[in-house]
Amino acid sequence: LRMSGKELISLFLRELLAGKEIIARCELLYRTYTYVRRADLGASERKELQKLVGKPIAPGIFASIMGSDPGFNLPRRDSFTLIGGRIFHFSHTKKYSKADFDQAYRQFLSSIPELRILLRDSLVDLLKEFMAEAGYQPSTEGGGELRFQAANRRARAFVFGSIRSIDREHRATAEEDCILLVPSGENLAPFVEFFKEEGERAAEMGLQIWVANMERGTIDHFV
């Protein structure tokens, strides 16, 4: 028998949490998005999960693991600590040594290249969902560029891993909007710095810089 989408997501997450009892907050979030994508949910499965954890699905499941919502029955990671400036989560029911936390941090560092890929893929998923709700349909995708079309408007979109990595050479045209999407961060300083140094220039070039809050599953206009 084929496993349901919910069962697949649960399986993926249980395996992850069994292997990483101490896990970086960002890694758990990105992998949750990835597992929802891999489950390839049908329309009815998607509606069922949205009733259970809210819309969008990945942030709702993530919140459940954090212990704020019992809707998705997964092992809780309801305590946290800072390691190397990063938030790591673990269960309050078990005691861990300094060596355990050091090992978790080393595992995280070795996973960074993969996590960058997962972050981009998750941002693309979120952007497609956001644009669809705004009445846009995807037309083409490739070379790091996504194109969308609505009844009387077109848009090009580019996804970046951070505000600091934005390519400033893009430009909007009279016929086509240009959207640069970046994730929100635990630190606001890079956004303040960008706004002071590049905000006026970005506005002159017609760029729309959007910020995705992946924990809430929202996208907001920045510049």
Give the positions of each predicted feature.
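Charged, structured surface patches that assemble and position nucleic-acid processing machinery
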Residues: F130, Q137-G142, F160-I163, E169-V223
